[in-house]
């Protein structure tokens, strides 16, 4: 059974490809690994994307279900002061952008460069793909900035956790 993540699905990433869901072979082998380790080899294919999906979905769930006043406490990260609420929002925004960029960069390459006919069909069926492909500037500088912000989002998450556990 393929895992479903409501928050990742809201980004427009199809369930069939996020996480390790794109791998369908060796089911018995994966079941044994899940029994032994609690996860299987699909989770380590692309660890940065697996972590991004985990962080994004958990921060969204925290934001949706938090009963605390997250504006009262603040953390300092990279010389800036963030309330917990601002930090969570910043993490969600930048991690979501990293996930969308990775997914849509693959789509851009596949559906614009390699298979333009399939790309036209995909754009008709999935408006999010069409909008993103039309509006996004495909520059290497964007990729490095998005990746840097994702790395900072991970650091900010650690900073929040240190504050919460102390």
Map each language-model feature to its residues.
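Cullin-RING E3 adaptor/co-adaptor recruitment helices
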Residues: 131, 138-164
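Short intrinsically disordered terminal tails
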Residues: 1-3, 162-166
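N-terminal prepro regions of secreted peptide precursors
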Residues: 4-137
């Amino acid at each position: 059974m393929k895992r479903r993540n409501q928050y990742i699905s809201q980004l427009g990433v199809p369930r069939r490809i996020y996480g390790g869901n794109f791998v369908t072979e060796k089911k018995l082998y994966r079941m044994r690994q899940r029994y032994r380790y609690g996860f299987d080899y699909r989770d380590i294919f692309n660890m940065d994307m697996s972590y991004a999906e985990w962080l994004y979905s958990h921060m969204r769930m925290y934001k949706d279900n938090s009963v605390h006043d997250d504006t009262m406490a603040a953390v300092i990260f990279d010389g800036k002061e963030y309330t917990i609420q601002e930090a969570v929002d910043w993490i969600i925004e930048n991690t979501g952008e990293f996930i969308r960029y990775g997914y849509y960069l693959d789509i851009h390459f596949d559906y614009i460069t390699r298979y333009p006919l399939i790309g036209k069909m995909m754009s008709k069926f999935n408006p999010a793909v069409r909008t993103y492909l039309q509006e996004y500037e495909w520059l290497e500088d964007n990729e490095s900035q998005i990746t840097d912000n994702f790395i900072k989002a991970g650091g900010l998450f650690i900073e929040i956790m240190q504050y919460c556990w102390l």
